[in-house]
UniProtKB/Swiss-Prot annotation:
Family matches, as InterPro entries: COMT-like (IPR016461), O_MeTrfase_dom (IPR001077), SAM-dependent_MTases_sf (IPR029063)
Protein source organism: Cercospora nicotianae
Enzyme Commission (EC) number: 2.1.1.-
Enzyme type, top EC level: transferase
Active site as annotated: H339 (proton acceptor)
Domain of life: Eukaryota
Keyword list, A-Z: Methyltransferase, S-adenosyl-L-methionine, Transferase
Record's protein name: O-methyltransferase CTB2
Signal peptide feature range: none
GO molecular function, one term: O-methyltransferase activity
Cysteines paired by S-S bonds: none
Amino acids binding S-adenosyl-L-methionine: D288
């Protein structure tokens, strides 16, 4: 990850900006990729180790530019600018609800009155004009006198339905939930319960978000949520392939008597199947809700069915007995599970995995590990804390620092020991390896620590 830029004067920050811009320009030029442009999508650069220089340079540009803006604004104007940021989401709520972008030609222009007429529902030309012009002020639309031209940013709301779903989720569901955090605290205190979050307070009900999504009139929001999760996971920093190819030595688990990998809350088994394809000596069991594992079992490729099984299971209950050979270990793999839950319930989930854990077994959590203050660039740090606040407002869940994970591991019986945290290059989720307290992993297994390139020890950032 890019380290924090510590420059604190105008010319030092400008130099950082020029240096990082030069590196990004050089990388794109060498790869024969287009340079950044307001008139075209961003260059398509795969998230992998080979392209690390590009992403490092891009992060450094954003970090230096944001520092520069804060510096020249000064503290008072920085606070005032921040106080108006919610207005952007307010405009976006109107844009998403009435699908303004769908009523603008992909190539060409239209008028505010034509958009209002196409939308109907009592939407006036004045409302369209005011919200469009506000969005245009931060680059989402481009306006011309008497008409409105669709700018490349908003084309994505028409051509990329998964991104549209994520933006909808942010503006229409998360924005009111975040605003209702103080109301929820006033009603319930600082709660560990999912039905006492900002989300429930924002809709005037004591209800958990996922419970609300299962109600008949919550189906649209549930569908948008599913699309948003699919979109954020596809090819980006949350892509599940980072868990498969991101530096964890899965091949070592096949040594000796081998391991059974139990994918706890594994959905339809996409991660287990990808691992099974790559590591033919390992066996897998996918656990999830009955209807989910039925889909997984149906879609599992025939050549994997002998090594990938499916079982309905509630991860708040004890693990069932597993058929293992003499000496064969068990790996309990849980991806993106704990962050949905407060410490109270995350501890209960880990406790069910700790009970019955043997010295040859281990737990691998695939979760965000929030860096401690000052360890990474401010943009990265803010992004991690943004995710944490999303979990708080929607579910009373939490993205955790390494020390927060360790506190959970120390609180269960038997106690657990954090062995290492591996952070895949360009991936957002770390691989957190845990064993019984007192277990020493073989020296060979300990050879991969921190980043996928084997540096930085257990911290991984």
């Amino acid at each position: 990850m890019v380290k924090r830029i510590e420059a604190d004067n105008l010319f030092e920050l400008t130099a950082e900006l020029v240096s990082a811009s030069s590196k990004l320009h050089k990388f794109l030029d060498q790869k024969n990729l287009p340079q950044p442009s307001f008139d075209a999508p961003a260059p398509s650069v795969a998230l992998n180790s080979a392209n690390k220089p590009y992403y490092d340079a891009r992060s450094a540009i954003v970090e230096a530019a944001e520092q520069l803006i804060r510096l020249v604004r000064g503290p008072r104007d920085t606070l005032l600018a921040l106080s108006f940021e919610h207005c952007a989401t307010a405009s976006m709520q109107v844009v998403f609800k009435y699908k303004f972008a769908n009523h603008i030609p992909l190539h060409g222009s239209t008028t505010y009155s034509k958009i209002a007429e196409a939308v109907g529902d009592g939407v006036t030309t004045a409302l369209v004009e005011r919200t469009i012009q506000h969005c245009a002020s931060f680059g989402l639309f481009e306006t011309i006198p008497g008409a409105m031209l669709l700018q490349c940013y908003l084309v994505l709301l028409v051509t990329d339905p998964d991104l549209e779903a994520w933006m909808y989720l942010s503006a229409v569901i998360a924005y009111p939930a975040g605003a209702a955090i103080p109301k929820a605290v006033e009603q319930y205190g600082v709660s560990h319960e999912a039905d006492e979050s900002g989300y429930g307070a924002s809709i005037g009900r004591k209800i958990a978000q996922f419970q609300r999504f299962r109600e008949p009139d919550g189906k649209k929001d549930h569908e948008m949520f599913a699309r948003a999760m699919r979109g954020i996971a596809a090819g980006g920093a949350y892509d599940f392939r980072h868990a498969v190819d991101g530096g964890y030595p899965w091949h070592l688990l096949a040594e000796g008597a081998g391991h059974l990998v139990v994918d706890v809350g594994g959905g339809p088994g996409h991660v287990a199947m990808a691992l099974a394809e790559k590591y033919p000596s390992l066996r897998f069991q996918v656990q999830d809700l009955p209807e989910t594992v039925q889909v997984g079992a149906k879609n599992c490729p025939e050549h994997l069915k002998s090594r990938v099984s499916f079982q309905s299971h509630d991860f708040f209950t004890s693990q069932p007995a597993h058929e293992v050979q003499d000496g064969e270990g068990i790996v309990y793999f849980a991806r993106f599970i704990l962050h949905d839950w407060s410490d109270k319930y995350a501890t209960k989930i880990v406790q069910q995995l700790a009970t019955g854990l043997r010295p040859q077994d281990r737990i691998i959590l695939n979760e965000v590990v929030v860096p401690e203050a000052g360890q990474v660039g401010r943009e990265t740090e803010r992004r991690m804390h943004d995710r944490d606040l999303l979990m708080l407002m929607n579910l009373n869940g939490r993205e955790r620092t390494q020390s927060a994970f360790e506190a959970i591991f120390a609180s269960v019986t038997p106690k657990l020991r954090l062995q290492r945290v591996i952070h895949p290059e360009q991936g957002e989720l770390s691989l957190i390896e845990v064993t019984l307290d007192g277990v020493e992993l073989p020296a060979q297994a300990n050879g991969v620590n921190g980043h996928a390139n084997g540096t930085n020890g257990v911290n991984g950032h």
